[in-house]
Amino acid sequence: MLGKDYMLAIILVNCDDDLWGDQNLEGETGLPPGWRKIRDAAGTYYWHVPSGSTQWQRPTWELAEDPGTGKEGIWELRPPKGRSFSSLDSSLNRSNSLTWYNEDSYVRSLEPGAKCFAVRSLGWVEVPEEDLAPGKSSIAVNNCIQQLAQARNRSQPHDGAWGEGQNMLMVLKKDAMSLLNPLDHSLIHCQPLVHIRVWGVGSSKGRDRDFAFVAGDKDSCMLKCHVFRCDVPAKAIASRLQGLCAQILSERVGLSGEAACCSPDPISPEDFPRQVELLDAVSQAAQKYEALYMGILPVTKAMGMDVLNEAIGTLTGRGDRKTWVPAMLSVSDSLMTAHPIQAEAGAEEEPLWQCPVRLVTFIGVGHDPHTFGLIADLGCQSFQCAAFWCQPHAGGLSEAVQAACMVQYQKCLVASAARGKAWGAQARARLRLKRTSSMDSPGGPLPPPLLKGGVGGAGAAPRKRGVFSFLDAFRLKPLFSICPKLILEGWGKRLYTLPVPRVL
């Protein structure tokens, strides 16, 4: 038997009549603005129309002064004890409640590793291709979140959005994001993960439950940013999505390395997630940023926002901004270099600071959104932090360095798979030579060089062990092990976490 809360939800969702004109919905006098009184078979309850929340208790006015003074009253929306129609109230995490349309059994029937999240679609906004460049993508995504959230609050829906304003179940599984109807679990939309270009989480006040992703629409041939309001902090969805993309990348690289001995075709960029391909294309040329070079400082650990903030604070306290050196920071996919701006024209002067991208272990934006720092591994358990002061903020520089790290990691994976392919081609050549020798000399032994390096000989094992131990090293370690802080919006108020791969 369904509980009262769930019965209310079913009645409202399946009601075909005009709810506003229904005689059971009463705009009773004395209720705070936005509240309606509803009577049905489940009983009498109160519905807050703007938020969709319901409660059994009659909402009350809380007067700032005595009611007899005639001053305007102030009302407060107290936490409802009933079911919220605007959300599923973390229904997937309930342990002691009744099922709603076999919801719990559906969750149990999902494939291992799949995760469900209760969301509501706010619609989509078209995004130009140029807005997805490093330094711009986070701003573009956050603008989409703000635009759709504000439009939704003004009850001005964006035309053409599938499922807009509808409660959904977002199911993240191995290779796709599925959006389902929470009542009958019918499929509303299926989005392959490899086609998702960018995703993000709102960071301004009240937007930490807004999640957005950008993907191409095959019908309209445009990039669309889809925005959702979540019942849980949206970072949970972003983290799960990041883990699935990392898993796809590692599996494809592993398969490419093992299948190289069977396929003569070179590794195609299509074998890797689209997000990494974009970073590779963007980072072909060095990007330059003006910043104040604050200096370097030895640190004790390779990663950690606390370590980075402490180092930035120490460098900030050593002197005021006048003592910092104006520099032009050049960021490529392999090297970062800071030159004094006064000496930019003359290439003879030594750079202020230089660091290969492969040595970077951690990046982040400090408490002051103008400050950016990174930690580099110098070897022998020695780590160094370099800090810069940026204007108007450090978001563009942080995204450029993140992109360089991911491109460097992609190149490392491609190189490892290419080495596996080269080993497979060499093994096939030896196998053909072995067969030819066997036909020409049925009873004769193979030449000593082939015995030493032939298939199954002593020479093949070290190569095979070397390739697979290299791949296993990445499988044993988290694919994205660094978590720098990158800002979407609200500088100095909230830091948004994005992972950056470490290149060994």
From Swiss-Prot:
Cellular-component GO terms for this entry: cytoplasm; cytosol; membrane; nucleus
PROSITE patterns, sorted: PID (PS01179), WW_DOMAIN_1 (PS01159), WW_DOMAIN_2 (PS50020)
MF-aspect GO terms: amyloid-beta binding; low-density lipoprotein particle receptor binding; molecular adaptor activity
SUPFAM superfamilies on file: PH domain-like, WW domain
Sequence ranges assigned to domain WW in this UniProt record: 29-61
Subcellular location(s) per record: Cytoplasm; Nucleus
Pfam families per record: PID, WW
Tissue specificity: Expressed predominantly in brain and testis.
Domain PID span(s) in chain numbering: 111-278, 283-438
Gene3D superfamilies xrefs: 2.20.70.10, Pleckstrin-homology domain (PH domain)/Phosphotyrosine-binding domain (PTB) (2.30.29.30)
InterPro entries recorded: APBB1/2/3, PH-like_dom_sf, PTB/PI_dom, WW_dom, WW_dom_sf
Disulfide bonds: none
Gene Ontology BP annotations: negative regulation of cell cycle phase transition; negative regulation of transcription by RNA polymerase II; positive regulation of protein secretion; regulation of DNA-templated transcription
Signal sequence, start to end: none
Keywords linked to the UniProt accession: Cytoplasm, Nucleus, Repeat
Primary residence: cytoplasm
Domain of life the protein comes from: Eukaryota
Cited function: May modulate the internalization of amyloid-beta precursor protein.
PANTHER family per the UniProt record, alphabetical: AMYLOID BETA A4 PRECURSOR PROTEIN-BINDING FAMILY B, AMYLOID-BETA A4 PRECURSOR PROTEIN-BINDING FAMILY B MEMBER 3
Subunit: Interacts with APP (via intracellular domain). Interacts with APLP1 and APLP2 (via intracellular domain).
Name of protein: Amyloid-beta A4 precursor protein-binding family B member 3
Originating organism: Rattus norvegicus
Gene that produces this protein: Apbb3
